[in-house]
């Protein structure tokens, strides 16, 4: 062959052109699916795997909790807790949360709170902390502690500021008449003051410690506003003072509730483009309910526009996507603690300052009017 000549196909091996025998497919191996009958976990098991046995017990506890058999569920969870190896952190957290929720339903709130505090202190990521804060919220809600309920809603919102449902719950809490304080006319010694005959004046209309009052809250030692020190000598003067303060407290609560609802609506509006079916239906229905509630507050249009601007400054579509598909962030305890509001004042200064500043001249005038009336 002359140098430089090229033969077509000469660069391939002969094996390339050989026809390989066809492989006959083997018959599929038999597969026996595990059939789980209803309440299959109540059957006796011969498994030697301790974790599998404990998992079955947890299922029994979960079913008992679902049936509201809290004593039975607590027994199951407690028996698991004693046998769990110290290295099985995931199941231990689940079991502890189950114990705490059962204790809360049984009225043993202090024991439930001890577990919740322990879970919060051991949280190593945002998912753990969210579960612990939600547990605190459930306990204080059952305990009917409005101040703490609002605080832990604020903590959850600090961790997940783009969750519209938490903002809706916060608005509802601001408008709830909480039983945190006894009757306003009751003295520290348990005796009724001269204003005790005014049964319409109840502490349930005052949200102590939650920032709902534009005036100093009463001290824990006394459920009576210091109206005597303000010059409210007569019973009529005292009733006028209390009525004015009650009205101011209700107005302040309505402002914050309205701002929270407006933010929830903004978040729902951005999320609706990514939702379908029942999720979208719930979204649109909630927006309608919010619109009706905001209308009932009867705030001026410029006030509502200011609230919408203030509560929507950080809302962008990219952040909404992150909230709908969150990533579990593993951070240190110090970083987790810094990510949530330490107090209601800190939270409300961050979120409601612009709204409060808008109304501050009116509040000052209202305060002066009360002092003159006193």
UniProtKB/Swiss-Prot annotation:
Q: Which Gene3D superfamilies match?
A: Tetratricopeptide repeat domain (1.25.40.10)
What InterPro entries does its record include?
Answer: DUF5588, TPR-like_helical_dom_sf
Q: Where is the composition biased (Polar residues)?
A: 188-197
The annotated region (Disordered) lies at 182-201
The record's section on SUPFAM superfamilies has: TPR-like
Protein name (Swiss-Prot/TrEMBL): Uncharacterized protein C8orf76 homolog
Name the species this protein comes from: Rattus norvegicus
């Amino acid at each position: 062959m002359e140098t430089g000549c090229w033969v077509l196909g000469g660069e391939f091996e002969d094996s390339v052109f050989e026809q390989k025998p066809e492989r006959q497919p083997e018959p599929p191996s038999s597969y026996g699916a595990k059939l789980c009958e209803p309440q299959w976990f109540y059957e006796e098991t011969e498994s030697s795997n301790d974790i599998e046995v404990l998992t079955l017990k947890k299922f029994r506890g979960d079913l008992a909790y679902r049936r509201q058999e809290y004593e039975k569920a607590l027994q199951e969870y407690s028996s698991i807790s004693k046998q769990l190896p110290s290295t099985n952190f995931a199941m231990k957290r689940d079991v502890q949360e189950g114990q705490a929720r059962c204790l809360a339903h049984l009225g043993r709130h202090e024991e439930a709170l001890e577990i919740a505090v322990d879970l919060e202190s051991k949280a190593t990521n945002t998912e753990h902390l969210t579960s612990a804060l939600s547990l605190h919220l459930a306990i204080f809600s059952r305990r009917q502690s409005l101040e703490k309920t609002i605080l832990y809603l604020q903590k959850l919102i600090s961790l997940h500021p783009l969750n519209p449902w938490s903002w809706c719950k916060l608005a509802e809490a601001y408008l709830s008449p909480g039983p945190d304080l006894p009757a306003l006319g009751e003295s520290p010694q348990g005796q009724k003051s001269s204003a005790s005959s005014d049964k319409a004046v109840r502490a349930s209309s005052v949200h102590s410690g939650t920032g709902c009052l534009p005036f100093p809250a009463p001290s824990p030692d006394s459920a009576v506003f210091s109206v005597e020190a303000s010059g409210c000598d007569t019973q009529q003067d005292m009733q006028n003072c209390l009525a004015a303060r009650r009205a101011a407290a209700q107005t302040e609560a309505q402002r914050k509730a309205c701002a929270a609802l407006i933010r929830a609506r903004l978040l729902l509006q951005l999320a609706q483009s990514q939702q379908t079916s029942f999720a979208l239906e719930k979204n649109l229905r909630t927006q309608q309910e919010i619109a009706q509630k905001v209308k009932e507050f009867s705030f001026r249009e410029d006030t509502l526009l200011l609230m919408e601007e203030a509560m929507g400054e950080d809302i962008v579509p990219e952040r909404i996507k992150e909230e709908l598909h969150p990533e579990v962030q593993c951070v240190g305890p110090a970083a987790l603690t810094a990510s949530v509001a330490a107090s209601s004042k800190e939270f409300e200064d961050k979120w409601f300052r612009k709204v409060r500043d808008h109304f501050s001249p009116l509040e000052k005038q209202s305060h002066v009017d009360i002092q003159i009336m006193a």
